Amino acid sequence: MGRYLDDFKIGEIFQAESFTLDEKQILEFALSYDPQPFHTDVAAAKDGPYGGLIGSGFQTLNLCFCRIVQSGVFDTVSMGGPGIEEVKFLMPVRPGDTIHTEAEILSIKPSRTKPDRGIMRVQYRGYNQQDNEVISFITIMLGKRNTTV
């Protein structure tokens, strides 16, 4: 059975399946969506500010978000979202890094004007295989309320 807005609790944390980024995935994403040399050119990246190729923070953000969505935890409640706030790329993600993601419910606010919905703020955090936090962001989710009870 799916969960509606009122079924979630502040402080609740959900885990998602981890993912590993390889060099090919990093290069393919960056060439299309974030074409900076430290994401697209292995040789140039060696002499760059990070001492080697690193993944785009936007790729990491997308994959962390995707893994939580794929977990199904928000399948019933989600009506999309009006925004993302406090995006922080905390550490580079390098080829071979395995990232695990968690999502924590920060706040739940039923709408005063539309009783079938509300807003839920969810903090996503991604950690590498050494358990170092590499990314953090907060989504603003428009969430369905169960109006049949």
Could you tell me what each predicted segment is?
Residues 1-83, 146-149:
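Hot-dog-fold acyl-thioester-processing enzymes
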Residues 3-10, 89, 93-149:
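HotDog/MaoC-like acyl-thioester-processing domains
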